[in-house]
């Protein structure tokens, strides 16, 4: 007998029905979409079996072409065929035009100085072009998976700034697609290899794509990735290999002053030759001119290696710098993950293996590894995994910091930091003999405490009574996967510590967060001026406090005239510090410093005399 499932209208009869979500690698050269199906993560092919979609958009009088169709026409219509649009994301037109590379496109500036491509379909910006690349990927996913997507995870380079990240989100919004998370490409690659569930240690992600190079050093600790350091070059990638080979071929064929159409044709052939040299020691290049003449030349792997050697060495130099920034050595790196189609180039793999001293991970297609990691993360974020498997639940919506002298805010954890996260910073005492320190934890983007949201207060007691600035207190902010903030303050020499816990997001609506962010931008200039004033006032108070203590102890080293002169300059500084002119306060501090140079020298001489009193030459 068949059993019927009964459910309320509009509701699923299966309470744990699989939710549809995908990961999208929105790449400079190619883009991919991947999904988890029946526990297996894989990229989704189009109807022709092609997994990667060329990140190329062509605008014609009749409509818009995307992907391979656009790529086929790019040589004949370079002006209206936009490639590597990711390089334009978040950049101003001035920035683009001041670069070394010339583009065939006709540009105009938007009201805010951003680039607009002039096309037969009208003016379009990089966000709109990116949306056209996302469109067929979303359509492919919904057709393959058999339903509407409930969200996507889109990957971005680790170095992308807020404007570039927001532009990527906006591109998805134009399609009405919900972005579950923007995931850094190196983290996605590590997740794809399952490194989040393996041994703890340091992992390097070497990502050489079409237009960018990114090296990230991650530390894996209990399934959580901590980014130790990132580096790279936002204008170095496989495209540059193509351009070098293109220039070489053009020189061999003695082609001068070629038009944009032939230049694009030559570039396409250079890319084909580069890819063929991955498995061959030599490849024949050919080019058909407008008059039907066919040019041919043999390109060897040795020639190609020689052309790109300097660029590959440049990536290794970035690796060296980034390891130094991370405070680790190449020997400490457990695994090196290769990401990006350009890592297929044999010379790249050879140089990376030589530098890190071990063969890099290449078992997952380097073109697909980021999309696969994004799909795994999308599957988690949409709710298809038990909560125990959730690693990256959220990001910190507003910066977390601590109040310092003068009512200033020292930000410890910046907004948009992925959680869980831990950050530490050192502070010191303000007064001689200070044995306790009060901590005020705040949230917000403003420079002064009064303009931020108060979260918690606590006190650290038992600090050794040392001179001002001698005690070192390490303050650690930890935000766990549930968004719970723990702040711990520890005096380093004694180990004495105090801590408090708070939920930073509690009671804050999206509207309130947005308002706080808008206020920080609106008052940015005013806030910086107020901060500079407060900093000078704090410095003036510190100088006066220190000098008063010195005078109380060694004032008898001065003549009455010297003492009166110093007292007068101190009074002048105290008066100016009550005003609102930061430059005047700074100048008054410098004047006081000049007037106390002799006093400082006398104190030093006296200290030496006291230290050596009663000592013989032999004992010194």
Swiss-Prot record:
The keyword Transcription does not apply. It comes from the Bacteria. Keywords: ATP-binding, Chaperone, Nucleotide-binding. SUPFAM superfamilies: Actin-like ATPase domain, Heat shock protein 70kD (HSP70), C-terminal subdomain, Heat shock protein 70kD (HSP70), peptide-binding domain. One of its GO terms (biological process) is iron-sulfur cluster assembly. PROSITE patterns: HSP70_1, HSP70_2. InterPro entries: ATPase_NBD, Heat_shock_70_CS, HSP70_C_sf, HSP70_peptide-bd_sf, Hsp_70_fam, ISC_FeS_clus_asmbl_HscA. One of its GO terms (molecular function) is unfolded protein binding. Chaperone involved in the maturation of iron-sulfur cluster-containing proteins. Has a low intrinsic ATPase activity which is markedly stimulated by HscB. NCBIfam families: HscA, PRK05183.1. Belongs to the heat shock protein 70 family. This is Chaperone protein HscA homolog. The lineage of its organism: Bacteria, Pseudomonadati, Pseudomonadota, Gammaproteobacteria, Alteromonadales.
């Amino acid at each position: 007998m068949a059993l019927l499932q009964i459910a309320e209208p509009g509701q699923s009869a299966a309470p744990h029905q699989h939710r549809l979500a995908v990961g999208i690698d929105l790449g400079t050269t190619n883009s991919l979409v991947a999904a988890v199906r029946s526990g297996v993560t894989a990229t989704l092919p189009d109807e022709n079996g092609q997994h990667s979609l060329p990140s190329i958009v062509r605008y014609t009088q009749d409509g818009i072409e995307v992907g391979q169709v656009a790529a086929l026409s790019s040589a004949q219509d370079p002006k209206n065929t936009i490639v590597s649009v990711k390089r334009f994301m978040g950049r101003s037109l001035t920035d683009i035009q001041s670069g070394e590379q010339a583009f065939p496109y006709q540009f105009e500036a938007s009201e805010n100085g951003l680039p607009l491509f002039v096309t037969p379909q009208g003016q379009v910006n990089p966000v709109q072009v990116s949306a056209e690349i996302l469109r067929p990927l979303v359509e492919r996913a919904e057709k393959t998976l058999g339903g509407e997507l409930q969200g996507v995870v889109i990957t971005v380079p680790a170095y992308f700034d807020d404007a570039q990240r927001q532009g990527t989100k906006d591109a998805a919004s134009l399609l009405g697609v919900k972005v579950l998370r923007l995931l850094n490409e190196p983290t996605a690659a590590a997740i794809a290899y399952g490194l989040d569930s393996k041994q703890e240690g340091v992992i390097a992600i070497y990502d050489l794509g079409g237009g960018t190079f990114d090296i990230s050093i991650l530390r894996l600790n209990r399934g959580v990735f901590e980014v130790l350091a990132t580096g790279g070059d936002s204008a170095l990638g496989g495209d540059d290999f193509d351009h070098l080979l293109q220039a070489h071929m053009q020189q061999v064929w003695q082609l001068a002053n070629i038009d944009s159409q032939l230049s694009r044709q030559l570039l396409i052939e250079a890319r084909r030759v580069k890819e063929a040299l991955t498995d061959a020691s030599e490849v024949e290049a050919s080019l058909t001119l407008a008059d039907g003449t066919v040019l041919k030349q043999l390109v060897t792997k040795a020639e190609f290696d020689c052309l790109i050697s300097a660029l590959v060495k440049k990536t290794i130099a970035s690796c060296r710098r980034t390891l130094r920034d991370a405070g680790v050595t190449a020997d400490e790196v457990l695994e090196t993950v290769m990401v990006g189609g350009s890592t297929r180039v044999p010379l790249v793999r050879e140089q990376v293996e030589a530098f890190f001293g071990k063969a890099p991970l290449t078992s997952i297609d380097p073109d697909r590894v980021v999309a696969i990691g994004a799909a795994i993360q999308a599957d988690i974020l949409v709710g298809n995994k038990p909560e125990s498997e959730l690693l990256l639940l959220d990001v910190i919506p507003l910066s977390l910091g601590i109040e310092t002298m003068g009512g200033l805010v020292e930000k410890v954890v910046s907004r948009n930091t992925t959680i869980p996260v831990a950050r530490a910073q050192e502070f010191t005492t303000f007064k001689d003999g200070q044995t306790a320190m009060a901590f005020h934890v705040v949230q917000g983007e403003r420079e002064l405490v009064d303009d931020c949201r108060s979260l918690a207060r606590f006190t650290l007691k038992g600090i050794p009574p040392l001179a001002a600035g001698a005690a070192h207190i390490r303050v650690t902010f930890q935000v766990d996967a549930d968004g719970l903030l723990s702040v711990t303050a520890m005096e380093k020499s004694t180990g004495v510590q105090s801590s408090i816990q708070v939920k930073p997001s509690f009671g804050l609506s999206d509207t309130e967060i947005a308002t706080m962010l808008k206020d920080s931008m609106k008052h940015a200039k005013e806030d910086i001026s107020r901060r500079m004033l407060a900093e000078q006032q704090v410095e003036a108070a510190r100088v006066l406090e220190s000098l008063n203590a010195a005078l109380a102890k060694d004032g008898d080293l001065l003549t009455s005239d010297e003492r009166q002169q110093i007292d007068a300059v101190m009074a002048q500084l105290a008066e100016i510090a009550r005003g609102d002119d930061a430059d005047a306060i700074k100048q008054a501090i410098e004047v006081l410093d000049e007037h106390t140079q002799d006093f400082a020298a006398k104190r030093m001489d006296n200290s030496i005399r006291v230290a050596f009193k009663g000592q013989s030459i032999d004992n010194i």
